[in-house]
Structure formats: C-alpha cells, structure tokens
Design a protein with these regions (language model features):
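S-adenosyl-L-methionine
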Residues: 1-60
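Conserved class I S-adenosyl-L-methionine
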Residues: 62-72
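Conserved SAM-binding loop of SAM-dependent methyltransferases across substrates and taxa
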Residues: 72-84
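Conserved SAM-binding motif I beta-strand of class I
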Residues: 87-92
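Conserved SAM/SAH-binding beta-strand->alpha-helix loop
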Residues: 94-96
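Conserved SAM-binding loop
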Residues: 101-102
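Conserved beta-strand signature within the Rossmann-like core of class I S-adenosyl-L-methionine
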Residues: 155-167
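Active-site capping/gating segments
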Residues: 165-199
Length: 199
C-alpha cells in the first residue's frame, strides 16, 4: 500500500508541475503572438531545443508526425514541418488555445503542412503516426503515456519533454518501463527531452 501512495504522489507532483507550466506558457505565448519582440525572445530559447528534438527523433518528410499540446503558438509543429517537410497533426485540449493556434498557422500560410485540431492526448487516435511529440505542458502525463503505450505503432518514436528526470521517475513508478525504453535524454535550459521507444 505504501508503494501505491508513492506512485500516486509522484504522479500528482509531475502533473501539478505540468499544470503550472501550462499557465506560464499560455501567458508567454499570448505575448509572443501579439508582440514580435516576445516572439523572437521565446523562439531564441525554443528553436534550438526543437531542432535538437527533430534530430533526436530522426524525423523525415515520410514520417506522419503528431504533436500533443500545441498551445496558441504552435511553434514546434510549424518548425517540424518547415525543417523536415513532414505533415504534422497537432492538437490541444484547450478550446481557446486550439482556435488561436489554428488561426496563427493559417496566417503563417502553413495550413497545408500543420493541421491543428481540437483533441486530447488521452484518447486521440494515434495508431497511424510514426513520431509523437509531447509538450512540457501536457497533463495528465500518466494517462497520455498509458494511451500511447496501448495504441501507438510498435516502431513509433515518442519525444516527451520533462523536468528534472520526472519522465524517467514516472515511467519507473507507473510500471511503464516494461513498455517504453528511454533511448536518449537531452538536457535543455529548464527542461529535458526524452526519446522513448516502445519495447
């Protein structure tokens, strides 16, 4: 029983951190879509991280790419499409973020390569995707990873953002290390990128 409580408290802590980041990113993305200075500032931090993740996941033009948690500034899905020429389907479960993000992609003339949909990572159909990205602000991460473990292609790659080894700890405590192998962990400013492969 004690171990179960540790799993629950660990998962709760991870999800609370992700919720806090969700609200932080809403504020930053709102500023970035309204004021070019903030967009440049945000992309100065984000772009090198996204480029590294694209390389880690070995994304090519042939891959079907799925991005969970695009927010109102879908900079990662847009960069993936621009850098690899892959088509990216991206979702957000916040209706307002989805609507603003969809309009932003349209304004940038990327609607043919970046498809923004309203959806939730805990139940979205993912079986056709080759590469799946999970943003740092996605929660409940435990339910999203369980959904992926049951429904993704066997050879799919998952690029998941986390904080201070929280994804590795969660995989251990949630008994998902039987399902996922952590292939690469990369340290970024404020975050980590985890490349997960299904065993």
């Amino acid at each position: 029983m004690k171990q179960h409580n540790n799993i629950g408290s660990s998962t709760t802590l991870v999800n609370w951190r992700r919720k806090i980041l969700f609200y932080e990113f809403i504020f930053l993305e709102f500023l970035a879509i309204k004021i070019d200075f903030f967009y440049k500032l945000l992309m100065k931090w984000r772009k090198p991280v996204f480029l590294k993740e694209i390389k880690m996941a070995k994304v090519t033009a042939k891959d079907k790419v799925f991005f969970i948690g695009c927010g109102m500034l879908p900079s990662a899905p847009m960069l993936i499409a621009e850098e690899t020429n892959a088509t990216v389907v991206t979702i957000d479960n916040n209706k307002r973020a989805y609507l603003i993000g969809k309009e932003y992609v349209k304004r940038k003339n990327l609607s043919d390569k970046v498809i923004v949909e309203y959806g939730d990572g805990v139940n979205y159909p993912i079986q056709d995707f080759d590469v799946i990205f999970i943003a740092i602000n996605v929660w409940p991460i435990d339910e999203v990873l369980r959904h992926l473990s049951k429904n993704m292609k066997p050879a799919a790659r998952v690029m998941c953002k986390g904080l201070k080894d929280d994804i590795t700890q969660f995989l251990k405590s949630g008994n998902l290390l039987n399902t996922f192998s952590v292939e690469v962990v990369s340290d970024n400013p404020r975050t980590q990128s985890f490349l997960l492969i299904k065993k």
